[in-house]
């Protein structure tokens, strides 16, 4: 009986540790000029997805399920044209600001 109680306590503690750790950060798949997700071949962290995510206005991204995934990418910046308008610092293209 004591072993069963001890086992139950251990299970509860491990489940609490998992819930304290939290869930995955929110994010999105960025879309290119044709409205498609960016394909990638090297799963996990790679330079290509990092660059794509920076163009879309976020700092971190990686290859997940053969597509670039950007953490904390908001819905308004998923499309490349919307992201460029919002994050481009080029005063020739946007002389009066955004």
Swiss-Prot record:
* Distribution of this protein across tissues and organs: Expressed by the venom gland.
Please name the GO terms that the record assigns under molecular function.
potassium channel regulator activity; sodium channel inhibitor activity; toxin activity
Signal peptide location: 1-22
CDD domains from the UniProt entry: neurotoxins_LC_scorpion
Q: Which keywords fit this entry according to its UniProt record? A: Amidation, Disulfide bond, G-protein coupled receptor impairing toxin, Ion channel impairing toxin, Neurotoxin, Potassium channel impairing toxin, Secreted, Signal, Toxin, Voltage-gated potassium channel impairing toxin, Voltage-gated sodium channel impairing toxin
Q: Where does it primarily localize?
A: secreted
Entry superkingdom: Eukaryota
Provide the disulphide bond pattern: 40-63, 49-68, 53-70
GO CC, any one term = extracellular region
Signal listed as a keyword:
yes
Where does this polypeptide localize?
Answer: Secreted
Which Pfam families does the record cross-reference, listed alphabetically? Answer: Toxin_3
Lysine amide: residues bearing it: 96
| Entry keyword Signal | yes
Coiled-coil residue spans: none
The LCN-type CS-alpha/beta domain covers: 26-89
**Family named by the database record:** Belongs to the long (3 C-C) scorpion toxin superfamily.
Q: What does this protein do?
A: The heterodimer non-edited LVP1 induces lipolysis in rat adipocytes. Induction of lipolysis by LVP1 appears to be mediated through the beta-2 adrenergic receptor pathway (ADRB2). The edited BmKBTx-like, similar to beta-toxins, may modulate voltage-gated sodium channels (Nav) and may block voltage-gated potassium channels (Kv).
What do we know about how this protein assembles, alone or with others?
Answer: Monomer (edited version) and heterodimer (non-edited version) of this alpha chain and a beta chain (AC B8XGZ8).
Domain notes per entry: Has the structural arrangement of an alpha-helix connected to antiparallel beta-sheets by disulfide bonds (CS-alpha/beta).
What name has this protein been given in UniProt? Answer: Lipolysis-activating peptide 1-alpha chain
In the record, what lineage is assigned to the organism producing the protein?
A: Eukaryota, Metazoa, Ecdysozoa, Arthropoda, Chelicerata
């Amino acid at each position: 009986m004591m072993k069963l109680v001890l086992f139950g306590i251990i299970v509860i503690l491990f489940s609490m540790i998992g819930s304290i750790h939290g869930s995955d950060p929110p994010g999105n798949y960025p879309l290119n000029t044709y409205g498609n997700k960016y394909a990638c071949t090297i799963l996990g962290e790679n330079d290509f997805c990092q660059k794509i995510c920076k163009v879309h206005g976020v700092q971190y991204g990686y290859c997940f399920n053969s597509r670039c995934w950007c953490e904390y990418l908001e819905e308004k910046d998923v499309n490349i044209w919307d992201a460029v308008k919002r994050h481009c610092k080029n005063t020739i293209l946007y002389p009066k600001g955004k």
